[in-house]
Amino acid sequence: MADFSAKTPCRILSLDGGGAKGFYTLGVLREIEGMVKCPIHEKFDLIFGTSTGAIIAALLALGRSVKEISDIYEKHVPTVMQKKNRREKSLALAKLGDEVFKEDKFDKMKTGVGIVTTRWVIERPMIFKTSIEQAHGRVGTFSPGFGVKVSNAVQASCSAYPFFERKMVKTDKGDLVELIDGGYCANNPTLYAIADAIMALKLPPENIRVVSIGVGVYPSPKQSWFSSTKWAQMLMSVQLLQ
């Protein structure tokens, strides 16, 4: 597990959401892994991820190499994304999660983790964490990942409603929580990771080092006001805000 001693810098890796653009994240991580010449989880004390970044973060924290994760992406991501509707996409995502993570829970992680999801009803973050040291004062009731399987937490972080169905998870306290993609709260989870380091781990800001990997910006071609696609996108935005 990570050493959260104030004597050494706390090294944070933050991975953005972005769907299939996670291939870009993996390209950057491949270079980092080549530089440090060891598994990435050995070089970072906290690895936070949202959506596609959550998949990568969880696999890195479980000790997988970037090559292994890239192979999973190349084999399975096109299959999930090519499904016709949200039910089929969600079923494919659940199947993939169960195959990759099996029965693993958060106590299997080799370093500190934060998997960012969004509570559907109250529109607030729910972050699945590994270490009791990340508990922000709720030490007495903390359990790694709320007792939820890694597979279910990652599926929730990727459940970009309405393109995927909402994900229901059951905590070890028996609570049923309906979750959607963490990107609705923080597509870039860096601030949540820094909050853990400063507020929960009580580390001074000068002892924090952050590597934040986004997925790039890809402007869409300008569309005419008379375009049906433009009006459909505007309608979708309004629905998401309601």
Residue ranges and their predicted role:
Residues 45, 177, 208:
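Conserved acidic residues
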Residues 102-111:
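A short alpha-helix-loop-beta-strand transition element characteristic
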Residues 67-92, 96, 130-136, 145-146, ...:
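Non-catalytic peripheral regions of patatin-like phospholipases
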Residues 50, 118-119, 183, 213-216:
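Active-site-proximal beta-strand/loop segments in catalytic clefts of secreted hydrolases
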Residues 11-13, 178, 211:
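Conserved beta-strand elements of the Class I
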Residues 3, 7-101, 132, 138-143, ...:
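Patatin-like phospholipase
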